[in-house]
Each structure stands twice: as structure tokens, then as C-alpha cells.
From Swiss-Prot:
The macrophorins cluster contains a single gene insertion (encoding for the terpene cyclase macJ) compared with the yanuthone cluster that produces the linear compound yanuthone. The gene is macC. It is a single-pass membrane protein. This is Cytochrome P450 monooxygenase macC. Heme binds at residue 448. Its main location: membrane. Belongs to the cytochrome P450 family. InterPro entries: Cyt_P450 (IPR001128), Cyt_P450_E_grp-I (IPR002401), Cyt_P450_sf (IPR036396), Cytochrome_P450_fung (IPR050364). The chain crosses the membrane at residues 2-22. It is found in: Membrane. It comes from Penicillium terrestre. GO terms for biological process: mycotoxin biosynthetic process; terpenoid biosynthetic process.
Length: 536
């Protein structure tokens, strides 16, 4: 009798297994074709732990602008076609704006309160609305541009006085901008403690959240029960990142609360910042401290990293392609002369500077693989099925290095954007997908809410650096130029945020008159704008 029960149970399990295999086979027949995988595990063995965007781009050249692969029983799709980005992520954004479940990101690190990882729900929409109100285009024009110009003026002064610290000046600048707008606290120098802490945390965060960097526990939950030391200590690494984030972000919330209390007790007025609006919202919407911390934290992360990295990439390109500097200088000199540095008001008269900014974003994007979307219901695309729950990757690297759109894509060539002189937000909203300049800000409802601030900051920073400085290769002991490594594999860091490895270059002012202008403008910026913000 016992043997009969065992046999019956075994047959039942076999039937269930065969049914699951048959169902999976039927679904796979309807999917967009992609690289063949193995039974049960799919393509897990083919996905590298670092720089997955390179593999995804390699597959796109074989399987086209939309293909799928399997991560165990789960389906993933990769979009490397700008027409499909517009059709799916933009026009069908209601279907494609969810996020995949991430045990590492949501449970171990952020507690589910990080805007980048949150699903498309009421809290996510409330957070997006709050960010938009403070960083929309009109607010940037009316309130934030004066700070952008003042901080980038200090950046010029820092490059002038400490040219050997060029890897730190852009980081200080962008961190100080976002810290001032979020919390009313500047980052006056490159060795300010909160700046060092943030960039250390972000480096760890970037590595642990890169596709393939941790075990696929969302697909195979049983992996959580395997001793983590056998799998790279992924739990400890994740928890350490989360602890660092919570400690740093929480410290700024507590400081803001204390500043509000002191101002109230002394009846003194103080400028309201983003955190003041969030703290007001906390009372109305019953937000937790963790939600408040990560709403400020996500803006701190995005505001600190993207702009600083892109300016460092631009300097790499200027050293390698000096002819770009020559054309930029001619444009800047015709508009500004030597007596003043460029400002945001010069935007329409400096189209080539805007082209340089766009080409920088395209050439070495800081996010070569956008954070994945998730499909919240079945969808049919060109006769193929994308089932509910599919993880959807926007392959930014592949889109930016598409030879049919950008001839000779490995060359830094601002003429790729000849005739496209509007801001990235305009092209992201355009119905003509061929006009889209780049995809560094994402797409659809997940478009970066800081796009308006970032665009203005990047232009101002690029214009001021090019107006004042000459960027050249460093010379070795024999007097030969030392080439900067811009190879996509060896020249940049690992992680979902990709930054240049430390490099050397020669930075020199273009003239004594320009150096004097920098110091005069910095003194004015310090006395009129920068002094309004607290320092640590």
C-alpha cells in the first residue's frame, strides 16, 4: 500500500512538472526570439556579473531591437530600438512603468522606500509629484539657476587653484548644488565629510545593484537559504549599503527638524528647502521617517552622480579630441569675450556647447543599462507576446552606439547632434522618436524627475569649463603625452552607475584675463548667493 502511495505521488509530481514544462514551452513559442538557453535555468549562465549592457548589445546585433531571454522560469526583454522605446515605454507607459521585485534592493537595503525601486502605486505617484513640484522647469528657471551658476563658478575657481584635483571638483559641485536645494547645506570643499560618505555609499550601491551582481533570489527564493558565504556574502554587502544610506540620510532629516525648531523658537525666518516640503507632507500623509529619508536620499544620489560623472567624461573627450575644444572656444569667445563667463541666459546662443553635452551623454552614459521596468499585464508587440511580469531592460548603451543612427559611434563627435539644439526634455516628449537625443534620463513615466535641473547644470558647467580652460594630455618623464583610457571595459568602473577610472590631464587657464574674471565672479557669487546656505 505504501508503495502505491509513493508511486501515485511520484506520478502526480511528474505530471505537474511536465505540465509546467509544456506551459513554459507554449509561452516561449510566442515570445520575441532571443538567445537559446538551457532547461530550467534559461540564460542565467550567459549573463555576466558585470557590464551586462555589453552582452545585451551583442545579442541585439543578432536578435534585433526586441528580444527575450530566460532567467530560470522568468522572462526578460531587452529593447534596443528607439521606435519601440516610444511605442512601449512612452505610449504604453501604464503597462510598462512597474518595477521588478527586488529582495536585495527593497528588503535588504531600502525597506521598499527608494523612488527608483518603488512600484507604480499611490506612494510612488505622491513622491514623483512632490519632486516634480520642486524641480520642474519653471522652478529651475525662477529659483535654482542662480545657485547653479554660483556653484559652477566655484568649480572654475577650484580648477584654477587646484588643477590636480580635477576628479573631485565636479563631484563637489554637483553634490553642493543638490545638498543646498534639498537641505540648505552646502558642500564647500571636496573633503567635506558628507560628500565622501555619500560617494562611498553610492559606489557600493552601484556594485550590489548591477544586473548579475547578486544571486537571482527573486526568481529562485530557495537561494536565500544557501549560506551566503558561498555566494559572495551578498546579504552582508547589501545590508551594509542600506545601513550606510539610512544613517547618512537620516542625519540630514534630523538636522532639518532641529533647524526648523530653532527658527520657530527664535521667530527667525529661514529659506524653505525641499526637505521642508517633505516634512510638511510627512504630517499630512503619515510618511515614515524611512520614507522621508529615502525621498531626500534618492534626489541626493541622482543629483550628485550623473552631472559630475558626465563632466569628467566630457573632459576625457576634450583631451582626446582637441578639435572639439577649438570649435567650442570660437563659439564662446564670440558670445562672452574674456570679461565674463557664460551663463544660462546664453543657452540659445551656444548651440555647439549643447551639442557637446548631448554627445557626452551618448558616448559614455553613466547608466548604460536603465533600471529595469516590469510589465503589469500581457502585451502583444509585432505579433509576439510579452507576458505579465516580464522584466524589461532599456539598453541605453546599445541605443547610443547604434551605427545606423550615430555613424562611427565610438568617436566623440558633437556633429551627431547638428540641428538638434533643444533640451533633452523636449526630445523625450516629442512624438518623433527619431529626434530623441539620448536615453540617459530613461523613458515613459520613469523619466528622471530631475531632468530639468540636470540639463541646466550640465550646460552651465560645460560652458564655463570650456570658456576658461584648456584641457591637454599629461606628459610623462620623456615628454610624451599620456593617453587617457576611454576603453568602455578598462577605462570605467563596474556597477549600474559607470564612472571614469581616475585619470590625469593638464588643466590650464586660457588667459590671465580669464583667470582674473573667475576670481572676481567667485567673490561675487560667494557674497550674493553661496552665503545664503549653511555649511557643515
Amino acid at each position: 500500500m505504501a508503495l502505491l502511495y509513493i508511486t501515485t505521488a511520484a506520478l502526480a509530481l511528474l505530471l505537474l512538472f511536465l505540465r509546467a514544462v509544456f506551459k513554459s514551452w507554449r509561452i516561449q513559442r510566442k515570445l520575441p526570439p532571443g538567445p537559446p538557453g538551457l532547461p530550467l535555468i534559461g540564460n542565467i549562465h550567459q549573463i555576466p556579473a558585470v557590464r551586462a549592457h555589453q552582452k545585451f548589445t551583442e545579442w541585439a546585433k543578432v536578435y534585433g531591437g526586441l528580444y527575450t531571454f530566460r532567467i530560470g522560469p522568468a522572462t526578460a526583454a531587452v529593447i534596443t530600438d528607439r521606435g519601440l522605446v516610444k511605442e512601449l515605454l512612452d505610449k504604453r507607459s501604464a503597462l510598462y512603468s512597474s518595477r521588478p521585485v527586488s529582495y536585495v534592493g527593497q528588503n535588504l537595503i531600502t525597506g521598499g522606500d527608494h523612488l527608483l525601486l518603488m512600484d507604480n502605486n499611490e506612494m510612488w505617484r505622491l513622491f514623483r509629484k512632490t519632486v516634480h513640484q520642486h524641480f520642474k522647469a519653471s522652478m529651475c528657471e525662477k529659483e535654482h539657476v542662480k545657485l547653479l551658476e554660483a556653484e559652477h563658478t566655484q568649480m572654475m575657481r577650484d580648477f584654477l587653484l587646484y588643477p590636480e584635483k580635477h576628479m573631485l571638483h565636479t563631484k563637489r559641485t554637483t553634490n553642493s548644488i543638490i545638498m543646498s536645494l534639498l537641505y540648505g547645506i552646502r558642500t564647500p570643499s571636496w573633503d567635506t565629510p558628507h560628500m565622501r560618505e555619500l560617494y562611498e555609499i553610492m559606489e557600493q550601491w552601484s556594485k550590489v545593484m548591477e544586473t548579475g551582481a547578486t544571486p537571482p533570489v527573486d526568481i529562485f527564493p530557495w537561494l536565500r537559504w544557501i549560506p551566503q558565504r558561498w555566494l559572495g556574502n551578498w546579504v552582508d554587502r547589501s545590508v551594509e549599503v542600506g545601513s550606510g544610506m539610512k544613517a547618512l540620510y537620516g542625519s540630514f532629516r534630523r538636522r532639518a527638524i532641529e533647524a526648523r525648531r530653532e527658527a520657530e523658537q527664535s521667530s527667525q525666518s529661514r529659506a524653505r528647502t525641499f526637505i521642508d516640503h517633505v516634512l510638511d507632507l510627512q504630517e499630512k500623509a503619515n510618511l515614515t521617517d524611512n520614507q522621508v529619508d529615502f525621498l531626500g536620499g534618492v534626489m541626493m544620489e541622482g543629483g550628485s552622480d550623473t552631472g559630475s560623472t558626465m563632466l569628467l567624461v566630457m573632459i576625457q573627450a576634450l583631451v582626446r579630441y582637441p578639435e572639439v575644444q577649438e570649435r567650442a572656444r570660437a563659439e564662446l569667445d564670440a558670445v562672452c569675450g574674456e570679461g565674463r563667463s557664460p551663463t544660462w541666459a546664453d543657452f540659445s546662443r551656444l548651440p555647439y556647447i549643447n551639442m557637446i553635452v548631448k554627445e557626452t551623454m551618448r558616448w559614455r552614459p553613466v547608466t548604460p543599462l536603465s533600471f529595469p521596468h516590469a510589465l503589469n499585464q500581457d502585451d502583444w508587440v509585432n505579433g509576439y507576446l510579452l507576458p505579465k511580469g516580464t522584466t524589461v531592460f532599456l539598453n541605453v548603451w546599445g541605443l547610443h552606439h547604434d551605427e545606423s543612427i550615430f555613424p562611427n559611434p565610438e568617436r566623440f563627435d558633437p556633429s551627431h547632434y547638428e540641428g538638434r539644439h533643444n533640451l533633452a526634455s523636449d526630445y523625450a516628449a516629442s512624438p518623433d522618436y527619431m529626434q530623441r537625443d539620448h536615453f540617459i534620463y530613461g523613458a515613459g513615466r520613469r523619466l528622471c524627475p530631475g531632468i530639468h535641473l540636470s540639463e541646466r547644470s550640465m550646460f552651465i558647467g560645460a560652458a564655463k569649463l570650456l570658456w576658461c580652460f584648456q584641457f591637454e594630455p599629461e606628459m610623462d618623464e620623456s615628454g610624451r603625452p599620456v593617453a587617457i583610457d576611454t576603453d568602455p571595459i578598462t577605462g570605467y568602473t563596474e556597477g549600474f552607475l559607470v564612472c571614469p577610472q581616475a585619470y590625469k590631464c593638464k588643466v590650464s587657464p586660457r588667459s590671465t584675463a580669464r583667470a582674473e574674471t573667475i576670481m572676481r565672479e567667485f567673490a561675487q557669487a560667494e557674497s550674493e548667493v553661496l552665503c545664503q546656505y549653511a555649511t557643515p
